[in-house]
């Protein structure tokens, strides 16, 4: 780690803390040459591989925008959407890899959204699962009711 003051290549860690549910590590460092102190932030990368093969960084904001469309006209707060996005990210990171496919992201959204708002869940599921008929909706509603009664 190069010192931002004198560009010396060595520093020592004075303090280390995890933040943002353990996904980020903040380290307080001190240069071994000039004794200047600085902070580094280390964040693990979570990549999403899309259906067309393109890979991009996981974005909670993008996830929230997508779920917000399903919640349009519903009484779902921005804070609730942020918590949902955080829960989805925790679930995806718990899978252990640094790369997930977009299908995994959609699957991770379904259960927390079902708990948050039933109508928004059906809207999201209809797009995510590519419903093409009323039978698709009926089947999903039947499965939904079965899970709800458990």
Swiss-Prot record:
Any one Gene Ontology BP term: negative regulation of DNA-templated transcription
Residues in unnamed zinc fingers: 3-34
InterPro entries: ATP-cone_dom (IPR005144), NrdR-like_N (IPR055173), RNR_NrdR-like (IPR003796)
Bridged cysteine pairs (disulfide): none
Cofactor: Zn(2+)
Keyword annotations from UniProtKB, A to Z: ATP-binding, DNA-binding, Metal-binding, Nucleotide-binding, Repressor, Transcription, Transcription regulation, Zinc, Zinc-finger
NCBIfam families hit by this protein: transcriptional regulator NrdR (TIGR00244)
Family: Belongs to the NrdR family.
Protein name: Transcriptional repressor NrdR
Source organism: Corynebacterium kroppenstedtii (strain DSM 44385 / JCM 11950 / CIP 105744 / CCUG 35717)
The gene coding this protein: nrdR
């Amino acid at each position: 780690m190069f010192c931002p003051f004198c560009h010396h290549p060595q520093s020592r860690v004075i303090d280390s803390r995890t933040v943002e549910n353990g996904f980020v590590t903040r380290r307080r460092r001190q240069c071994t040459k000039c004794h200047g102190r600085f902070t580094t932030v280390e964040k693990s990368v979570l990549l999403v591989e899309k259906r067309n093969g393109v890979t991009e960084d996981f974005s909670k904001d993008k996830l929230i925008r997508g779920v917000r469309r399903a919640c349009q006209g519903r009484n779902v707060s921005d804070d609730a959407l942020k918590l949902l996005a955080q829960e989805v990210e925790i679930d995806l990171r718990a899978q252990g890899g640094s790369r997930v496919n977009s299908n995994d992201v959609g699957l991770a959204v379904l259960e927390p959204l079902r708990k948050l708002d039933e109508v928004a869940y059906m809207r999201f599921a209809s797009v995510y699962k590519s419903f093409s008929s009323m039978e698709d909706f009926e089947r999903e509603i039947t499965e939904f009711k079965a899970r709800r009664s458990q």
